[in-house]
Amino acid sequence: MPINPLYLFPNLFTASSIFLGMMSIFYASSYQFVMACWLVVASLILDGLDGRVARLTNTTSKFGIEFDSLADVVAFGVAPSLITYFYVGYNFGRIGMAVSALFVIFGAIRLARFNISTNTSDPYSFIGIPIPAAAVLVVLCVLLDNKYHFLEENTEKLFLGFIVLLGVLMVSNIRYPNFKKVKWNLKLFILVLIFLSLVFVRPLETLSVFMGLYLIYGIIRWLFLMVKIIFNKNKSA
């Protein structure tokens, strides 16, 4: 059966994401962490394009969904995990190995759960922080340390703890916004333009603030919901 060439187009973006993920791993193993980290960010851009291209060309397929998940494991699971290990994890021996490995495992679980719940969950939110967001948070920490040098012996332990936290958040039931499903309007368009302008001027700092707020938003929202549930239970008791 002949294959429609259009089906290859979105998968080319996915394959490119895997390629960048592998390049990131190679650079990390050579201790070229800045390049390794920015390659993960570049993979995020490609990851956001493949699904949109598939929908625009009407070439969505089960193969594309599974291929995208495998790409995410490489680019947003293995790559940031090894960046973590080569950057600070090796200083902690087996603990560093375990933390790096757990990040990949939790990320794979997150992707598997996403694939089986896509048609049943709220399309405007994710259950658990998405693995691309977790990966970008990891590499942004490394990039910030390369620029501002805040990781020392004690703070390196906190960094590993942060990696564990991201892993737990990926498999948690805490909801995070799904920006792929936002409804565009003039106000949002202006906000995006402002954001892109800030990224152009100060890319690292702007992305770090944005992703930090994204991370905290989910946790604070969850805490408010827990307090509300407890309050309602006490009120009805």
Residue positions per predicted region:
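Interhelical loop and helix-boundary elements at the membrane-water interface
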Residues: 1-18, 53-73, 112-133, 173-186, ...
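Helix-coil boundary and interhelical linker segments in multi-pass alpha-helical membrane proteins
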Residues: 23-38, 74, 78-99, 140-158, ...
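Hydrophobic, membrane-facing alpha-helical anchors
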Residues: 48-55, 104-116, 155-173
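Topogenic membrane-insertion module of multi-pass membrane proteins
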Residues: 1-48, 187, 199, 221, ...
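Multi-pass membrane catalytic core of lipid/isoprenoid biosynthesis enzymes
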Residues: 8-15, 56-111, 141-143
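C-terminal membrane-associated helical module and adjoining short loops/tails
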Residues: 123-237
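Alpha-helical transmembrane segments of polytopic integral membrane proteins
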Residues: 22-25, 42, 46, 80, ...
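Alpha-helical transmembrane segments
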Residues: 9-16, 36, 70, 74, ...
